[in-house]
């Protein structure tokens, strides 16, 4: 999913800001000032959507029933041209084959959709006999098409299959997919060059700058896992700094357990904090709600490996 795709063009040159979980945004010297060529950004954005979708699937499975809300999930990322400016529609059709119908942007390996035969690039014609056009027309105001379709899947009764009517290479195909029920938190990708991740009570927002900074999916999983941990723990804003610091420490620890339970490498993931620390040359601007990157890294390394998976509710 993506939250802000109305901006035309997709920047790859990075002027990164340290805004991820506790560092004030500070513009870094432009190391690669050139933007991605106009005709390439949809392909790169689709790649990033797939990357986030794969990490989301694994972390939601690892969280299991620990999240306050669980929902049926089949492991797909959906996309629709309506989330983009009309002037970009011809480019989207030419580069990522997205035209009038919503499409499957990615399928998580090993997910119900993957095992049933759904593939990236499939056009979504209907869900359970209800046309995509009908679902789109009745969606609440302000809801993007991809979310409306995923919400339709999330309302599936336990044990019931979702019937996908798809078009692939001109042929209309039908797949019956039985969702799994697990953590309902979704990862939302938004276009921003800052290194940022934040959460509310339902979703985790990940910036494209964070994706560019995270060298591996292990690092990305630690960032996302930290934010999912805030949701699991029911953390809220507006508390004293000392209390908030305890929340952040707990989210670090639970986020590490989540990424381990999801099958990611803890040692590789923790390097995210190390690399953020190496860039934090103005540490005096760090929020009092967070300990130093060095202290946080040391605390994570001292934690025992995760043993109980999926993680248990607090």
Language-model-derived ranges and their functions:
Residues 223-233, 250, 254, 258:
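Active-site His/Glu-centered metal-binding helix of metallohydrolases
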């Amino acid at each position: 999913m993506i939250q802000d795709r109305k901006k035309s063009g997709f920047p790859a040159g990075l002027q990164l800001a340290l805004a991820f979980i506790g560092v004030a945004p500070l513009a870094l010297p432009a190391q690669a000032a050139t933007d991605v060529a106009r005709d390439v950004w949809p392909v790169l954005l689709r790649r990033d959507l797939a990357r986030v979708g794969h990490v989301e699937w694994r972390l939601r499975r690892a969280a299991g029933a620990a999240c306050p809300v669980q929902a049926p999930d089949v492991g797909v990322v959906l996309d629709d041209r309506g989330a983009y400016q009309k002037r970009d529609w011809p480019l989207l059709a030419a580069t990522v084959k997205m035209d009038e119908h919503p499409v499957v942007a990615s399928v998580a390996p090993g997910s119900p959709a993957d095992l049933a035969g759904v593939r990236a690039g499939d056009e979504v014609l209907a869900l359970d006999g209800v046309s995509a056009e009908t679902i789109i027309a009745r969606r609440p105001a302000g809801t993007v098409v991809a979310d409306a379709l995923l919400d339709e899947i999330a309302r599936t009764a336990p044990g019931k299959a979702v019937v996908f009517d798809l078009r692939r290479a001109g042929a209309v195909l039908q797949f019956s997919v039985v969702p799994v029920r697990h953590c309902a938190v979704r990862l939302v990708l938004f276009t921003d060059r800052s290194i940022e991740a934040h959460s509310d009570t339902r979703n985790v927002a990940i910036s494209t700058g964070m994706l560019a900074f995270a060298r591996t999916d292990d690092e990305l999983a630690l960032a996302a896992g930290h934010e999912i941990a805030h949701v699991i723990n029911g953390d809220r804003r507006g508390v004293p700094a000392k209390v908030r610091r305890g929340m952040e420490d707990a989210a670090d620890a639970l986020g590490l357990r989540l990424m381990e339970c999801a099958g990611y490498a803890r040692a590789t993931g923790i390097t995210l904090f190390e690399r953020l620390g190496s860039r934090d040359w103005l540490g005096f601007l760090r929020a009092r709600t967070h300990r130093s990157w060095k202290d946080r890294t040391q605390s994570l390394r001292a934690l025992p490996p995760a043993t109980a998976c999926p993680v248990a509710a607090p």
